[in-house]
UniProtKB/Swiss-Prot annotation:
Belongs to the frog skin active peptide (FSAP) family. Brevinin subfamily. It comes from Rana dybowskii. Residues 23-44 form a propeptide. Disulfide bonds join 60-66. This is Brevinin-1DYb. Expressed by the skin glands. GO terms for cellular component: extracellular region. Keywords: Amphibian defense peptide, Antibiotic, Antimicrobial, Cleavage on pair of basic residues, Cytolysis, Disulfide bond, Hemolysis, Secreted, Signal. It holds the Pfam family Antimicrobial_1. Its main location: secreted.
Length: 66
């Protein structure tokens, strides 16, 4: 009887953990789908910072004045 209770408790515990992990993953996916414009803004910021960093090198190559 004791081993049966132990087994059932273990199954309940593992099931609870797996359900909570699935719920967290689902919430993360929903969050990613809810805010695509924020992600686009982050990509634009990264692109602009890279473009501004490359600008002096570009002028150096074009005008040959470093």
């Amino acid at each position: 009887m004791f081993t049966l209770k132990k087994s059932l408790l273990l199954l309940f515990f593992l099931g609870t953990i797996s359900l909570s992990l699935c719920e967290e993953e689902r919430n993360a996916e929903e969050e990613r789908r809810d805010y695509p414009e924020e992600r686009d803004v982050e990509v634009e910021k990264r692109f602009l910072s890279l473009a501004l960093a490359a600008l002096p090198k570009l002028f150096c190559l074009i005008f040959k004045k470093c």
